[in-house]
């Protein structure tokens, strides 16, 4: 009810980095807890060093499956004269606003690409606001709201927003870029959120994390696994953090 996008920022990071890791690609093995690191030996997961097939109290497996199926319902929100894009990804929906119904069609490869294309199709020309969430990681010097996880590098580029190919002015309200105008069927909004590789530290008050950094790109936090590296990954050392680049890898099962 607060209308503050910071809660959606946390939800997005949890969906991409926590929830998806709780279930394997085949959908038949699960984490009961959420480890930030694991050596494959210590049996942290109800007697298992990795994901387990089932649990004595098996509330987690059906809940994670249910959550994944509920995600489409979290992608949009609305009030009488506003449409909110709360999560990004290919989708379409119809929103009932005061005086009109609006069909929205979103095209994007997010979270791997920061370009979002939104076609706005009101049943009749109408004035209302389209509100695009601009994540904390894209508009500030910290990865998530709260003051715990600052970036090593400063922000490198600004978010760009256009309507029908023309750069448009917008105002920020609680983490949303608000575009208020008379909309016509076929209007197209394009959002471009830069996604450089960035490194995240933790404030020194969290002593356990001193000397550690997280590698991120957009909303994704990357994990180092032995299968992808030539040796143990418990102690990896980063060189010049300004030299990092992202490459697309062809992972198994079409991911």
Where are these regions (language model features)?
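Extended extracellular/luminal ectodomain segments enriched in beta-structured repeat modules
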Residues: 123-130
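C-terminal beta-rich recognition modules with glycine/proline-rich loops and embedded aromatic residues
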Residues: 9-17, 22-121, 139-163, 168, ...
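Active-site neighborhood of glycoside hydrolase catalytic domains
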Residues: 1-5
């Amino acid at each position: 009810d607060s209308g503050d996008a910071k809660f959606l920022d946390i939800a997005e990071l949890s969906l991409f980095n926590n929830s998806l890791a709780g279930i394997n690609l085949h959908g038949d093995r699960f984490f009961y807890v959420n480890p930030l690191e694991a050596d494959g030996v210590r049996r942290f997961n109800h007697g298992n060093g990795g994901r387990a097939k089932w649990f004595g109290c098996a509330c987690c497996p059906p809940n994670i499956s249910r959550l994944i199926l509920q995600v489409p319902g979290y992608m949009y929100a609305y009030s009488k004269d506003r449409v909110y894009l709360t999560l990004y990804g290919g989708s379409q929906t119809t929103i009932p606003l005061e005086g009109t119904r609006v069909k929205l069609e979103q095209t994007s490869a997010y979270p791997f690409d920061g370009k979002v294309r939104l076609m706005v199709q009101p049943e009749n020309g109408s004035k209302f606001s389209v509100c695009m969430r601009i994540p904390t990681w894209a508009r500030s010097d910290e990865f998530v709201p709260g003051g715990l996880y600052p970036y090593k590098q400063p922000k490198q580029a600004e978010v760009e927003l256009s309507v029908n190919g023309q750069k448009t002015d917008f105002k920020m309200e609680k983490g949303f870029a608000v575009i208020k105008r008379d909309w016509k069927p076929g209007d197209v909004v394009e959002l471009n959120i830069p996604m450089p590789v960035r490194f995240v530290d933790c404030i020194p008050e969290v002593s356990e994390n001193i000397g550690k950094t997280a590698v991120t790109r957009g909303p994704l936090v990357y994990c180092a696994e032995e299968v992808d590296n030539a040796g143990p990954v418990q102690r990896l050392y980063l060189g010049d953090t300004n030299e990092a680049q992202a490459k697309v890898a062809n992972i198994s099962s079409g991911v």
